[in-house]
Regions:
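A hydrophobic C-terminal alpha-helical subdomain
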Residues: 11, 222-281
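Rossmann-fold cofactor-recognition segment
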Residues: 43-56
Length: 281
């Protein structure tokens, strides 16, 4: 059986490729990338690498040719064409190439999420369902790495109230994705997440790592914005950060699920140990 991974040169993709090679062998793995030269530098020498650009459906059809299962890693917004157009190209190409199964990295509760961040994922899930391709939606919660700025041993200031997040390591999500890809018994939807924790919980874990007390202070969104402006962040970045904080405050990342641990076959890394992995300690 031939397996493909799109966007394979990204960090998530690289971890997924390594995990997949370990499970099925290099001969059965195809990495699909936009930049072949970059891929040759980042990916194992013994796997097949094919060029496939989300902006070019025909290149994707060729890249998917002969593949049985594909891990479709969602793109980042802000490209030459919209992310939804890119994703439409991918789904159309999967169907045209007669791929039998696709695992798609989606957004928490994409079928009911209110955040603007979810809209492309909601639409992509709909496209995949309508394509008739057997699928699993991997609704990844939040990477702990996204909070790297809060893991430096300084006090934490945030604007998310008591909102909780299902933090887990990016590699844990990637490893879970590959486990689903190779499974013969899959669910249509996985809500992948770690245990739900708030920023006070995060501060306690950071305190344990550094051996000193780390305080967590919740502030109003307007005050948080002022702090970000003083830190020299640009308007777009500030807007995105505030959107994430509001997303958390509204409870959209609160999740009680064991899907990720169940798929991995073991408990997720304890939060203090996961923090050490992120900061390289």
């Amino acid at each position: 059986m031939k397996y493909g991974i799109t966007a394979a040169t990204g960090h998530f993709g690289q971890v997924a490729v390594k995990e997949l090679v370990g499970l099925v062998g290099a001969d059965n793995v195809v990495a699909i990338v936009r930049n072949l030269e970059k891929a040759k530098q980042l990916l194992p020498d013994d796997i097949e690498i094919r060029q496939g650009d989300y902006d070019d459906k025909n290149s994707l059809v060729s890249a998917f040719e002969g593949l049985d299962k594909v891990l479709f890693i969602s793109s980042q917004p802000g490209g030459k064409i919209s992310r939804l157009e890119q994703h439409t190209n991918v789904v159309d190409a999967l169907k045209e190439a007669k791929v039998k199964f696709v695992a798609y990295t989606s957004f928490p509760h994409a079928d009911q999420a209110k955040s603007a961040l979810a809209s492309d994922h909601t639409a992509t899930e709909k496209l995949i369902v309508e394509s008739g391709i057997k699928h699993s939606f991997l609704r990844n919660n939040w990477y702990l790495e996204n909070e790297a700025g809060f893991l430096n041993g300084e006090d934490i200031v945030y604007a998310a109230g008591d909102g909780k997040v299902g933090w887990a390591l990016e590699r844990e999500y990637a490893e879970g994705a590959v486990k689903v890809l190779v499974s013969d018994a899959t669910k249509d939807v996985y809500e992948f997440a770690g245990a739900s924790r708030n920023y006070e919980d995060l501060a306690k874990a950071v305190s344990e790592v550094y051996g000193k007390e780390i305080n967590a202070t919740n502030v109003a969104s307007d005050d948080y914005k002022v702090g970000l402006e003083k830190a020299g962040l640009d308007e777009n970045t500030i807007g995105f950060i505030l959107m994430i904080q509001d997303l958390i405050k509204q409870g959209e990342l609160t999740e009680e699920t064991s899907d990720l641990a169940d798929v991995l076959g073991h408990e997720l890394k304890a939060l203090p140990e996961a923090i050490k992995e992120v900061i390289g300690r």
